[in-house]
Amino acid sequence: MIARADDGAAFRVVDGFSRIVRLGEGLEASGALAPAAMDRALAALAVCASKIRKRGVAAFRGVATEACRRARNGAECLARVRAETGLALEVIAPAEEADLALAGCAPLLDRGLPHGIAFDIGGGSTEVLWLAREAGGWRRVDFVSLPLGVVAIAERLGAGRVADADYAAAVSDIADRLGELDARHGIAAHVAGGRVEMIGTSGTVTTLSGIAMGLDRYDRARVDGSWLDLAQVRRFSAELAAADFDGRARHGCVGPERADMVVAGCALVEGICARWPVDRLRVADRGLREGILMGLMRGP
């Protein structure tokens, strides 16, 4: 994402590029980034580097997250990136990843409630934040980085129709992994008392929102800032799990690139909502990249 600073803390996007590369494909089993996955990432980053040079970018920051944190050859991958594209990427810790995602989507947490839950579902990990509203904005009280993202869960569930029992087991596993965070802060009691708003930033929640709105093709302007209630999450997650790969791929809000991963993302969303059943969920088509841009605009 390439942007120009406007007045105040705002920015205007002037160029961007996004491609699914599945860098963590096979990582859970092998402990290493696969050569083919690195090749896909390098090809995408070469496009990014070309855009950066063309636009004469004055300030740049590129980050790597869970796949490079976990892989024994993560440093080798980053060295290749620098040698072949000229881009210097830094591996960031889960806490910084969580904070950057929050910075990018916090403006949408606007219901005036005292507590918040934010989650960011990625390919290799899922960050879940427990937040407190303060005079200056939202403060991260605690968080957990689950070593589960859509790539690893998709490898477990497979690309075709997902059996009800397998899907339910994935949802239960995710909900269970959030138990310690819940217990540390009594989050469930705050949710039951109606004192918590929730926001999700990921391709999964935006896809579910697009489907819920009946969009034939994805429309960021309509999806970003929209709402999903739990009944919608459950209904459309079940429909996606019951569909085969081709059925998912034909939907304009899913497409062939994500057809084998979207059910894994649905399981993550449902697991979080099973642990904390808020009345509705805010949808953000923004997050980590926007958080990085805001940091660059603030300067060192």
Task: Describe every region a protein language model picked out.
Residues 1-11:
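N-terminal basic/disordered segments at the start of proteins
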Residues 9-25:
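N-terminal glycine-rich anion-binding loops that anchor highly charged ligand groups
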Residues 22, 26-55, 67-115, 132-133, ...:
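Helical "lid/coupling" subdomains associated with nucleotide-phosphate turnover
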Residues 59:
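Cationic, histidine-enriched alpha-helical/coil surfaces that engage anionic ligands
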Residues 115-125, 129:
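A generic, well-ordered mixed alpha/beta core segment in the N-terminal half of proteins
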